[in-house]
Amino acid sequence: MCPPVRQRPAQAPPAKRQALETVPHPQNRGRLMSPKARPPKMQRRPRPPVAKRRRFPRSPQQVERPILPPVESTPQDMEPGQVQSPPQITAVIQLRQERDTMRPPIYLPALLANCGPAGLLRAHRLPQPKPPCLSRQRPSPDSQTSPC
């Protein structure tokens, strides 16, 4: 009688096979190894890309867009005999940036409005503004000057 035919053991599914191949079992091989602190470079996961910060922020010309007035005439309103002409824009087109530099906004203090950005640097050297005088609201007829 011939010896029984040796068959190959059934293969493990691919995920388990990969785990078995990559994870060393040094005890089975007869030697003890401590696991590596860092896997080699090819097995390391790549870092996600970091959002790039701009060294110089964008200038207002790149950020701001011109404010266009709404176009009043549309091609559907035109009569068939009338020749279509380019729409007449009567409003002045301004960039927001230009409008802001012409006149300071209302909410800025008067010091900044009068002296510009240098006023903020000189603000600590100037005397404190006096509180509004209450006697000016009710001027008496006999006194010409206010006590404050």
Swiss-Prot record:
Bias type Polar residues, positions: 137-148
Extent of Low complexity compositional bias: 1-17
Keyword Transmembrane belongs to the record: no
InterPro entries with a match to the protein in the record: DUF5451 (IPR035221)
Pfam families: DUF5451
Methyltransferase in keyword set: no
Coiled coil: none
Keywords per UniProt: Early protein
Bias-annotated ranges (Basic residues): 38-57
Stretch list, region Disordered: 1-86, 122-148
Family: Belongs to the Epstein-Barr virus BLLF2 family.
Protein name, per record: Uncharacterized protein BLLF2
